[in-house]
């Protein structure tokens, strides 16, 4: 694995081509991550199900805003999606100027922070959605998914995009680190 | 900000000193992260509270294993802690050989994965502990912390170490990336 450390100057054109490839892959992964976080936020944000007779005295309408963890999920996915859109110009700049150093460092640190944010959001939402599906006998929390069938399906589905974005952000950090190491 | 890109060869001794400083800081942060994840896992894992008459027919004993999210918290913090201990020799090697490239790349990708793991664990546990404290009126989940006072305090407290480790791992990724960029 250490063979790449010798003769770096003689392989400059090849290295540059690979760096450009890495930068293009970075851009593609970023676009996919934008789509998946945006889809997650929209899918969760637009979920609602009205149950006319859930309790005898109120009309029950289930929305994401009823559960704080799902609200956090929508907000966090929107933030990550906005950040990823803002990072696209920088990613395009890296294709043109593949030796950039400080801008890649900036991307790595923000990508890591956004990785933490999107992971926190998807895992808090997962904990709550899991509870909605299964309930918890010891804590006496009942599963609410028998009543709220389509609500539970939509919320479960919208987790997928967020977990996808998590994996993509780990890959993006790896790509940026590889680009830094290749210089 | 781009001024560092010129005259890199002439500043080699200074750069090496800074790189060594970065590597030492990396080691210190790793040790702190080991302690905080280990403390979190132990604090959560040893929590239990017995309520003799919570319900009239069973003796209620609250443990972390009653809630899947808290079990995940203990497991994930143990894994991250074990990984961080295993990464210490590599971190020490970086102090001696500050120009290392591939081993830093390996550390960055594993640090990013462990960041995702510890964030997922702490945020899922936070969602459940928050629910235990506040309950949720819409889903008809009652707050269980009135009865389980010391259980709730211990579990809330053990979240701190995990969130600390999250911040430390973001800093570790930044330090590794900086070391790669400085080479």
From Swiss-Prot, chains A, B:
This is Casparian strip membrane protein 2. It is a multi-pass membrane protein. Keywords: Cell membrane, Cell wall biogenesis/degradation, Glycoprotein, Membrane, Transmembrane, Transmembrane helix. It comes from the Eukaryota. The keyword Transmembrane helix applies. Residues 1-23, 93-104, 180-183 are cytoplasmic. GO terms for cellular component: plasma membrane. Homodimer and heterodimers. The chain crosses the membrane at residues 24-44, 72-92, 105-125, 159-179. Glycans are attached at residue 48. Residues 45-71, 126-158 are extracellular. One of its GO terms (biological process) is cell wall organization. Its main location: membrane. Belongs to the Casparian strip membrane proteins (CASP) family. It holds the Pfam family CASP_dom. It is found in: Cell membrane.
